[in-house]
Swiss-Prot record:
Family, per entry: Belongs to the MtrA family.
Organism: Methanobrevibacter ruminantium (strain ATCC 35063 / DSM 1093 / JCM 13430 / OCM 146 / M1) (Methanobacterium ruminantium)
Residues in compartment: Extracellular: 244-245
Its EC number(s): 7.2.1.4
GO term, biological process aspect, one: methylation
Any GO MF annotation of the entry: tetrahydromethanopterin S-methyltransferase activity
Subunit-level organization: The complex is composed of 8 subunits; MtrA, MtrB, MtrC, MtrD, MtrE, MtrF, MtrG and MtrH.
Descriptive protein name: Tetrahydromethanopterin S-methyltransferase subunit A 1
GO cellular component: plasma membrane
Length: 245
């Protein structure tokens, strides 16, 4: 049997919308924008729940994972969160970490991918402790259940270090720390992305129209020059007999 260690007192240490199972299970599951957390929980996950924002949401996931050294796998499943792109942001944090000063997740494509409440040692612990399993955009209950059970069978045992507890501040208690980064809803972020896309398309159409207008002007000029040239040649041909006489 794999070696186990105690999780932090009162684990999970951060509140959230999740189902808690056996704290000695090696598997944590985030269902991203989907609400089918009952499936991985029933399959034996230690904790399972949605994660909809690429800042506070990810901070909570990381805090609850590193405070339980028994968790060695994090399965990302369910629908990706539009606008926030939370699943990809978690992958980027695990692979690339974050800027040590700005705390922006390196390589994340979400709207506001900042993990200000996670110290660098917490980020490194997250990277070292768990293996990510990518089932993003997969809501199939059978596939999720099978993957949870597969990870349980591969349990390497508890992480070598004890539980790490960090505080995740949900309020804005430190206004002097700098400009607050306010989470936005997935719908708002998606709307902004679509507006930017429309603006780009409008600019592209304008460029095409200008190009077509330039081509049209060039064609008109060519026709006029050809017409004038034809008239001049015709005039000279008509005048040739008279000049010869």
């Amino acid at each position: 049997m794999a070696d186990k260690k105690p999780a932090a007192d009162n684990w999970p240490v951060v509140s959230g919308d999740y189902i808690v199972g056996d704290p000695e299970s090696p598997v944590a599951v985030t269902t991203l924008a989907s609400h089918n957390e009952d499936i991985p929980a029933a399959a034996g996950a230690a904790i399972a729940g949605p994660c909809k924002t690429e800042n506070l949401g990810i901070e909570k996931v990381v805090a609850n994972i590193i405070s339980n050294p028994n968790i060695r796998f994090l399965i990302l499943c369910g629908a990706e969160v539009q606008g926030h792109i939370t699943g990809q942001s978690i992958q980027a944090l695990h692979e690339n970490g974050c800027d040590p000063e700005k705390k922006k997740i390196t390589g994340a494509t979400g709207a506001i991918p900042f993990v200000e409440n996670i110290p660098m040692e917490g980020v490194e612990r997250f990277q070292q402790q768990v293996e990510l399993v990518d089932l993003i955009d997969n809501e199939d209950g059978g596939a999720i259940t099978a993957k949870v059970k597969e990870c349980i069978e591969k349990d390497p045992g508890a992480f070598e270090e004890d539980a790490m507890v960090i505080e995740v501040k949900e309020g804005d208690d430190d206004e002097d720390e700098g400009e607050e980064i306010r989470p936005i809803s997935a719908e708002t972020a998606l709307l902004e992305a679509r507006i930017r896309n429309i603006d780009t398309q409008v600019k592209l159409v304008g460029a095409v129209q200008r190009n077509m207008a330039g081509n049209y002007s060039g064609k008109v000029q060519g026709i006029m020059i050809g017409l004038i040239f034809t008239l001049v040649i015709g005039f000279l041909l008509l005048m040739a007999p008279l000049l010869g006489a």
